[in-house]
Amino acid sequence: MMNASCSPNTQNSIDSDWVCRVRAVRKISKGEEITDTYVSTMANTLYRRRQLKALKYFDCGCKRCADPTELGSHFSTLLCRIKNCGGFLLCRDPLVSSSPWACLKCGAEVDGEQVKREQEQWEERVEAAPRLIPDQEKLLAALKQLFHPNHNLCMDVMFNLAPLYGVRGSKAEDLVSEAEKKEKMCGELLSTMEQVIPGGFRMRGMLLVERHTTKLFLLRTQLETKQCSKSTFVRNVASLRAPLAEAVKILGLEPPGSLESARLVQAEKYLAQVDSIVENAGKTLLPAGTE
């Protein structure tokens, strides 16, 4: 086994010949430990350490697990239960599962076992919730009453919601509103991921493509409804190239036949389209159906 970290600097993939390939997802300095993860990096500390203990038989003490804020991401942070406080509850010692949680603002404490039970109950609710926009939005609103908006349970629901927005079958008048929500959600997910797992992870590549299609749809809508000039449209489309090129670079490292490699084909098509629009100085509008 490679050394474990919940914010690893490598990622592996297994190809059709069952060869496991490990690659760096960010620069690894000389002498720096090379690490991998054995649990979902998009889970909170309580869940990750519980799973690692049960399945891999060790107590993780990595930098992320030891930090109550999870590297500043607040991936585990709760909201204070004292009415009108508005403070954040952090675990006093994340490496001790029964450790109490304390509010940074008022100092109120909550028993660690109570927090564990509460989170497990909400994990079950998130898992069981219907994958429909109204149900997921209602669940997200409820979670944000108890957890920091960056908490992994909120992130999980956002991952569920984002693909539901703007799908075929949505009412025409809802498409723009849903696209705006989707773009904002993708941005929030990418920002939080950059804190807990910085680097070229496949999940980042997939999200960058998802956000690109949404941004492209919104820009096209602005042009068609005369909310922007052609020159502004072209300039804004040009700004989409860098993140899309990053996605192509990330997904290009995934094995053939994988979901990510299929997404790569789409990303390359979108990249060529962006280049064509910019090169033609906005004279050619986007082909139909590219949203």
Model-found features: residue ranges?
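Helix N-cap/loop-to-helix boundary motif
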Residues: 144-158, 172-176, 194-205, 230, ...
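Amphipathic alpha-helical repeat scaffolds of TPR domains
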Residues: 115-141, 150-171, 202-223, 265-277
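Amphipathic alpha-helical segments of tetratricopeptide repeats
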Residues: 140-145, 163, 184-194, 245-252
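Acidic, serine/threonine/proline-rich low-complexity intrinsically disordered regions
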Residues: 167-183, 221-238
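Helix-turn-helix repeat elements of alpha-solenoid scaffolds
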Residues: 127-139, 175-188, 236-244
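TPR/TPR-like (Sel1-like) alpha-helical repeat modules
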Residues: 232-255
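C-terminal SET catalytic tail plus cysteine-rich post-SET Zn-binding segment of SAM-dependent SET-domain
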Residues: 4-143, 149
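Eukaryote-biased recognition of C-terminal alpha-helical segments
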Residues: 213, 248-291
